Regions:
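Active-site region of the double-stranded beta-helix
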Residues: 1-239, 249-354, 359-364, 368, ...
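Noncatalytic modules at the cell exterior or secretory-pathway interfaces
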Residues: 238, 380-387
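Conserved beta-strand position immediately N-terminal to the Walker
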Residues: 241, 257, 372, 380
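C-terminal interaction modules of eukaryotic adaptor/scaffold proteins
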Residues: 371-378, 388-391
Length: 403
């Protein structure tokens, strides 16, 4: 949902694209948004993803790199923008997000022979020696920079392994994970901060994950760069995480609401038959190894929306970027709510239930799958005929904002 030229939204009645509509009627964006992000363009893309098969391990460029990649290779990088993303779980969600803590990577190099083999004994030892005793270095310190350099060297070695080497080593990794799951990565364990049960995860859990992913992408390099190098993440309904530019991630399963800056630039690493730009991938990543809990978002109250009858709740997911935020609304049957006009354009989707939305004499019926564009400064009233759940992506900037 949005104005991106790859797949612009369309007015159901007229067939006119939203891109053409906001170009013809710039007041639908408003001067502040047009001034900050350019005319004729919503600064965000809004998506619903239902993930049955893992999506590619990937990262997205920042603004400077996005411009460089687009200029050099417009076929694979169709625009010049960055693409930070936010994912909100509608159902239980699994994914990968950012590199594991360094001590976990060292432990896996020692406990998973195929991992050390594909990296190489000398390179694995060089990594373990470089990070030993400074795994929790202060961000930006000389030790932290050395850690990131060591992690980059390790990742580069993996991503540049030959296809035959990956195929053979991954096959043996999967065979051992399947036949020796109870002893896989013996001694490896970590406390899962994002798990609902606050449980300890062990090598057995990793073995089951690897064998499951292998049924989707047999003997793929993603089994190493995702399963062993990246944090495994679980989100439960209502939880969200923010995915920064230049950090690797992947979606494994679940239903999510996703919002991102308006870009289609993707640099892929694994679990994909598509183009993998290994050189740019290796050079662009931040190699941050911060706890994944830092990327989990805390929903905020939204005082500009409130129930006028019955039970209604609104919470805001507000990432640390200017392009977008998402407002979740939940209304119980027969409840009504009022939402003040927002200072920028927005798109609302209904994911559950039925009801109606109205403003200044105009009324539209809502049902699961309804998508509504709402102009800046438009107050709306929402009424639920049955339990109603909506998500509304929007942008608000001050007139002086320049990006």
């Amino acid at each position: 949902m949005g104005t991106h030229p790859s797949v612009p939204s369309k007015n159901i009645a007229s067939g006119e694209t939203l891109r053409d509509l906001v170009t013809t009627h710039p007041e639908l964006l408003g001067p502040a948004v047009s001034g900050a992000f350019g005319a004729g363009e919503l600064p965000f893309l809004f998506k619903v993803l239902s993930i049955r098969k893992a999506l590619s391990i990937q990262a997205h460029p920042d603004k400077a790199l996005g411009a460089q990649l687009h200029a050099a290779d417009p076929k694979n990088y169709p625009d010049d923008n960055h693409k930070p993303e936010m994912a909100i779980a509608v159902t239980a969600f699994e994914g990968f997000c950012g590199f594991r803590p360094l001590e976990q990577i060292s432990a896996l190099l020692e406990s998973v022979p195929e991992f050390k083999e594909i990296i190489g004994d000398a390179e694995a030892k060089a990594f373990e020696t470089a990070v030993a005793g400074q795994e929790h270095a202060a961000e930006g310190s000389p030790e932290d920079k050395a850690n990131r350099k060591a992690l980059q060297a390790l990742f580069s070695k993996l991503m540049n392994a030959s296809a035959n080497r990956v195929e053979d080593t991954a096959r043996r990794l999967v065979e051992r994970a399947a036949s020796q799951s109870e002893t896989f990565a013996a001694g490896f364990a970590y406390f899962d901060e994002l798990a609902e049960d606050n449980g300890v995860r062990r090598g057995t859990d990793l073995a089951h994950l690897i064998t499951r992913l292998n049924t989707q992408f047999p003997n793929d390099i993603g089994l190493f760069c995702g399963g062993l190098l990246l944090n495994y993440v679980r989100l439960y309904p209502g939880e969200a995480m923010f995915l920064r530019a230049k950090d690797p991630h992947a979606y494994i399963s679940g239903d999510i609401i996703e919002c991102m800056a308006a870009s289609d630039n993707v640099v892929r690493a694994g679990f994909t038959p598509k183009f993998k730009d290994v050189d740019n991938l290796v050079s662009m990543l931040t190699y941050s190894y911060n706890p994944v809990l830092e990327q989990k978002m805390k929903p905020l109250p939204f005082p500009r929306a409130h129930a006028t009858n019955g039970s209604a709740e609104f919470i805001l997911y507000d990432p640390p970027i200017a392009e977008f935020a998402v407002l979740e609304g939940k209304l119980e049957p027969t409840a009504t709510a009022a939402v003040e006009g927002l200072a920028g354009p927005s798109i609302l989707i209904t994911t559950e239930g039925a009801g109606k939305i109205s403003t200044q004499g105009t009324e539209i019926t809502l049902h699961a799958g309804s998508v509504i564009f709402i102009a800046p400064g438009t107050p709306v009233d929402i009424e639920a005929s049955e339990r109603l759940v909506t998500y509304r992506a929007f942008v608000e900037v001050s007139p002086e904002t320049k990006l």
